[in-house]
Design a protein with these regions (language model features):
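A detector of single, family-specific signature residues
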Residues: 1-243
């Protein structure tokens, strides 16, 4: 019985459309086209055009995480290729187009000359997203405090040293009679208060993550390791078996 030809697929993903190329065992192009950048449409195209699929290879990028998980969920064997390393192979194409990039990715995954990039679980990405959002909020609070201090100096308002509520009380104590400046300081203090409320909400959410996640509980059991450090470590490592 004649062995069926294996297929390899390279999708070049963009926001609206994804260029897809299918190559056979010999690396020859047997189908190419474009489909909407929907996991269902991409998966359906792969199943139709590459019935003897061995592997799909796509570059890392902004949409790689959700698409990798979505395709895997539909039973499609897909690897993520480091964008910088894939770029070296794609430079060999005569003309850089989405169509040619898809062909280059299909040829690359056919060759096997690549190391797949580890994609973390969606739970880890969710936890990391909240942690990153909290970090941004903290930076925004610092920026707002510095702006308030700078404005106070500009208009000769003397603020006492202190952080948190002490700082806000200090600002309110020296609010000028000038209605424009008073309204400005009140507005900035209101923004700062809102940022702090959101930071506290993130703190509660992250504390819940740390309590409910087994790996976080293990890491945070070490002396001096709090929930934020535990989450940062666990979400960076994800699967210890890959090290």
């Amino acid at each position: 019985m004649e062995e069926k030809m294996k297929h390899f697929v390279g999708p070049d993903v963009s926001m609206k459309e994804t260029a897809v190329c299918v190559v056979d065992d010999s690396g020859q192009r047997i189908w190419e086209g474009s489909v909407p950048s929907s996991a269902d449409r991409i998966a359906a195209t792969i199943r139709e055009k590459a019935p003897e699929l061995l592997r799909v290879g796509m570059e890392t990028g902004p949409q790689a995480v959700w698409l990798w998980h979505a395709l895997r969920k539909q039973g499609i064997a897909v690897d993520c290729l480091h964008a910088r390393r894939a770029a070296a192979a794609l430079k060999l194409q005569a003309n850089k187009t989405d169509r040619n990039d898809a062909f280059g990715l299909a040829r690359l995954v056919h060759s096997g000359w690549y190391e797949p990039v580890a994609i973390k679980s969606l739970d880890r990405y969710r936890m990391r997203a909240v942690l990153t959002a909290r970090e941004r909020i903290v930076r925004m609070c610092t920026t707002m405090i510095n702006q308030l201090r700078g404005l106070a100096k500009t208009f000769g308002l003397m603020l006492s040293a202190g952080k948190g509520q002490v700082f806000e009380t200090s600002v309110r104590r020296v609010l000028p009679d000038d209605t424009v400046l008073r309204d400005l300081f009140e507005s900035l203090l209101s923004v700062l208060s809102g940022l702090k409320d959101q930071r506290r909400a993130f703190d509660r959410q992250l504390a819940r993550f740390a309590r409910e996640d087994e790996a976080c509980r293990i890491v945070s059991s070490a002396p001096g390791i709090g929930s934020l450090t535990a989450i940062a470590f666990v979400t960076a490592v994800d699967d210890p078996a890959r090290f």
